[in-house]
Design a protein with these regions (language model features):
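Catalytic cores and adjacent flexible loops of soluble metabolic enzymes
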Residues: 1-350
């Protein structure tokens, strides 16, 4: 598998800036104008991409399949009720959304939930495919999407390590080596104790060289920011223009534009702070190096020719003289010059 590749011209993977996806899902509420607002505000918030979901209710769920989430606006409904309410955007609608994203300078793609959706998105020339956690073991769908030859983003919620390996192998079988694995806990919203960020490190060890990130279902920006500090190369966060909207059940648990902006800013701050694993004096520390450290200092006046004794010495700031770790080497030397009391001692003096 490749450790670095490109999505719509942007490098993604190991050693690259974290790729931030605003996961709009179906928060467009089947309203094209709202979909365009999602795109515009995501771009203004600093996200690298926006992602939607492409499905038809009848192709992914039976009419009686119970929900695994709570939906206040329809508490007794089934999965089919939700999906059927939110699957009304046509291929032409998606074409319009992708065109609008290109117009405002934001990468856009979608999660296909069936082979027909893959084909439609491929025809629309999306730059990547995302496979949802629940479909990682739907191997025919994974292979069908991977065969298109675009980068694959695989969420791993509910999956065993063996199932993740099988999904990677499915991509390899059809010649797709451009894959990102996203750690995920399939719970909406997910409390911090359920996130298990260290699983990202486990995925990195299990599949060396494969880029790893986080599909985040927590509230706020703390968890995804911490994920970047642990090495996440991609963050996906649910996104809405307004948490109070009805329609999609995801609005209330999604980041709004202010939160997305805060998340992107926090991630970029962490990236700058991570720096490099080389210990030494940083350029920003140069003044502190000179003036916050201490030097061997005369505790009394030391006339020229005097053999220096320990009681004649102390150590004080600044650090422009002999480092205190060499104090014992100064003891027993002869003063070459008159050294006034409270003087920073240099090697030229002794």
């Amino acid at each position: 598998m490749k450790s670095t590749f490109f999505i719509d011209g942007r490098p993604v993977g190991l050693g690259q800036p974290c790729y931030v996806i605003a996961e709009a899902g179906v928060n467009h509420n089947c309203d094209l104008a709202l979909g365009k607002r999602l795109i515009e505000t995501a771009q203004a918030s600093g996200a690298d991409a926006i992602k939607f979901q492409s499905y038809e209710a009848g192709k992914i769920v039976t009419r009686v399949a119970p929900r695994y989430w709570v939906e206040a606006q329809d508490p007794r409904g089934t999965q089919w009720d939700t999906f059927d309410r939110l699957d009304k955007l046509s291929a032409e609608d998606f074409r319009a959304l992708l065109a609008h994203a290109r117009k405002v300078g934001l990468t856009a793609f979608s999660t296909p939930f069936d082979d027909d959706a893959v084909d439609i998105l491929a025809a629309l020339d999306v730059p990547a495919f995302k496979i949802a956690s629940a479909d990682l073991t739907t191997t025919p769908l994974v292979e069908h999407a991977a065969r298109v030859g675009r980068p694959m983003i695989l969420s791993t919620g509910t999956c065993t390590l063996g199932e993740v390996e099988e999904a990677l192998e499915a991509c390899r079988r059809v010649g797709n080596e451009e894959v990102v694995l996203l750690h995920c806990t399939l719970k909406y919203p997910c409390p911090p104790e359920g996130i298990n960020l260290r699983m990202m490190e486990h995925l990195m060890r299990a599949f060396p060289g494969v880029p790893v990130g986080l599909s985040d279902h927590s509230l706020g920006v703390a968890v995804p920011t911490a994920a970047v500090a642990l090495g996440a190369c991609m963050i996906e966060k649910h996104y809405t223009v307004d948490k109070t909207l009805l329609g999609s059940p995801d609005h209330h648990l999604s980041a709004d534009p202010a939160e997305m902006r805060a998340l992107v800013d926090s991630i970029r701050t962490v990236e700058r702070a991570l720096g490099k694993a080389e210990k030494g004096v940083e350029p920003l520390e140069r003044k502190a190096f000179l003036y916050a450290r201490r030097s061997v200092t005369s505790a009394v006046a030391i006339p020229r020719g005097t053999t220096i004794e320990r009681k004649m010495l102390t150590y004080k700031r600044p650090g422009t003289g002999i480092n205190p770790r060499f104090l014992d080497l100064v003891v027993g030397r002869v003063a070459r010059v008159d050294i006034p009391v409270d003087t920073t001692i240099t090697w030229e003096m002794v």
